A protein has these predicted regions:
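Conserved nucleotide-sensing/catalytic segment adjacent to the nucleotide-binding pocket
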Residues: 96-166
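Histidine-centered nuclease catalytic patch
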Residues: 24-55, 68, 105
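Conserved beta-strand scaffold positions in the cores of enzyme catalytic domains, especially
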Residues: 76, 99-103, 172-174
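Short, charged surface segments at domain edges that flank catalytic/cofactor-binding sites
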Residues: 1-24, 40-47, 68-73
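Pre-Walker A (Motif I) flank of P-loop NTPase domains
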Residues: 72-77, 142-144
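Short metal-binding segments enriched for Cys and/or His
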Residues: 58-71
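ATP-dependent NMP and nucleoside kinases share a basic, alpha-helical "lid"
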Residues: 110, 150-202
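Glycine-rich phosphate-binding P-loop
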Residues: 75-96
Length: 204
């Protein structure tokens, strides 16, 4: 990640054109901008031009890291829904032949075909694999079509993942399954707790 400063004359033009409020608006944003942020990251060939620069607060700039805005490199989609939601059916008509799907359930199934018997350790391993894949793909400068699939849009490192996705212009899809339909299923204790957390979010 580059640390050299932008030419003050270019920065002045950026502020005159776009203002000096943080343009990212990540969770915890301090609003007042103190740093320069590249729309196309410098590491991906982004230039110090007025068109490619915006002002950001230190917090949001650090939180973004080198993640691309959706469409400036990888195009990123997120699909979220309650336990046992039919994610595959929801995405079926939208996936391309070369789409990349990062699914917690699929990763867990690869580790433990009988998911109901998955230990906490295996669930943690699947979560770490999901995080690693999502983090790497979110920084890709290649024109990939990436679909991130999970139930709860949060993790220990990213407690408000949904707000981050929206700030980075991800295409977010919410699968709306009535609560009574979900709780009528033969859920595992883990799925039941997750379902309670999901419906407490009141996402639509």
């Amino acid at each position: 990640m580059r640390r050299q400063t932008v030419d003050p004359r270019i920065r002045a033009k950026v502020i005159a054109t776009y203002g000096n409020r943080c343009w990212l608006g990540m969770p915890g944003c301090s609003i007042t901008a103190t740093e320069d942020d590249h729309i196309v990251p410098y590491s991906h060939g982004g230039r110090d031009t007025v068109a490619n620069l915006r002002r950001a607060c230190k917090h949001c700039n650090a939180m973004r890291q080198d993640r691309v805005l959706s469409g400036y490199g990888a195009t990123l989609h997120a699909v979220i829904g309650p336990p046992r939601a039919d994610f595959g059916m929801a995405m079926q008509s939208m996936l391309r032949r070369d789409s990349i799907v990062v699914s917690f359930d699929s990763l867990l199934r690869d580790l433990c075909p009988t998911q109901s018997k998955a230990t906490d350790g295996l669930r943690l391993a699947a979560a770490m694999a999901w995080d690693g894949a999502a983090r790497t793909l979110a920084k890709s400068s290649e024109p990939l079509d990436v679909w991130l699939v999970r139930t709860l849009p949060r993790s220990r490192r990213h407690p408000d993942m949904l707000a981050e996705w929206l700030a980075l212009d991800y295409d977010v899809h919410v699968i709306e399954t009535p609560a009574d339909s979900t709780f009528a299923l033969d859920l595992t204790p883990q799925e039941y707790r997750t379902a309670q957390q999901w419906y407490a979010l009141h996402l639509t």
